[in-house]
Structures are given as C-alpha cells and as structure tokens.
A protein has these predicted regions:
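Terminal amphipathic alpha-helical/low-complexity segments used for targeting or macromolecular assembly
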Residues: 1-59, 115-118
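Flexible, glycine/small-residue-enriched loop-and-beta-strand segment within the central core
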Residues: 66-76, 81-151
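Extended, charge-rich alpha-helical segments
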Residues: 62-63
Length: 151
C-alpha cells in the first residue's frame, strides 16, 4: 500500500513521502495562483480551480484567499460559496454537497495525530529528516448547509 493509499484510507502514513510532498506542493502552488487573481478574472480563476479541484460542480465561487493541502481529494457540489480564508486540509476525502455556503475563516481539517505524545512526537529517519505519524478522518457536509464564520 502506498503512503497516498494509506492516507486516503485513514491509516497512519508518512506525510514526508516524496509523492505526497509533490502533490501538496502543487496544491499550495495552485492555491497561491488563485489567490493572486482578482474576482473579475473569472476565466483565469476557473482554469486554476479546474486543476486544483477537478471534482467541483457548476457555479462554485471561492472568494479567496483559499488554502488547500491537496485539492483533488475534495469534492464540491454545485452552487457552493466560500468567503475569505477558506482552508481545506484534505488528507482524507472531503465531500461538500450542493449549495453549501462557508463564511469567512472556515477550515475543514481531516488530519489527525496520535493522542499519546510518545506516538505523536517527531521521529527521525536514518538520513536525519524528521517526520510525524499522521492519519485522517473523512469529512462529509450535506447539501444546503450554511457554515458560518470562524468554524
């Protein structure tokens, strides 16, 4: 089982895995590109969003700034709206239904860390690089929800 397969299945995985690091870097880069656009640059925003969130519905509007860990592991239905500072840490699948509204400063966070410090603390590989054990829990938000601000 690859580290990505473990991650998406909610099993303990190594987030420093090369493939995951590349995917996360791409998600961060696309988030920044989106954040560097204006509301009026609709076509450019759509192109970036199509690459960042290939599983999004029609008529989605993300105000920006936005922050995605990966992007492709998030599914967003039709007619969704997210206000300023929308953050999605999608180490496990995130499913958002149709017509869901997010107020400012909302975060959807799937990552989990072991509760016991002995298991949670940073570990070191033979080459000296540090990593932590992480796992995730999927999040599903049904249709027609309004998630207010600072949630």
């Amino acid at each position: 089982m690859t580290e990505q397969e473990k991650m998406l299945a909610g099993k303990i995985y190594d987030p420093s895995d090369k493939t995951l690091t590349e995917l996360r870097t791409k998600g961060h880069r696309l988030s920044k590109l989106y954040n560097d656009t204006f509301d009026t640059e609709e076509e450019k925003r759509k192109e970036i969003l199509d690459e960042l969130l290939p599983n999004h519905g029609e008529g989605c509007f993300l105000q920006g700034p936005i922050y995605f860990d990966y992007g492709p592991f998030t599914t967003m239905g039709n007619g969704c709206y997210a206000n300023f500072n929308f953050t999605v840490l999608d180490t496990c699948p995130v499913t958002i239904g149709d017509s869901v509204f997010f107020g400012p400063n909302c975060t959807i966070a799937t990552p989990m860390h072991p509760f016991r410090w002995q298991e949670r603390n940073i570990k070191f590989k033979d080459d000296g690089t540090g990593y932590d054990d992480e796992y995730g829990k999927p999040i599903t938000i049904g249709s027609n929800c309004w998630i207010a601000s600072n949630v």
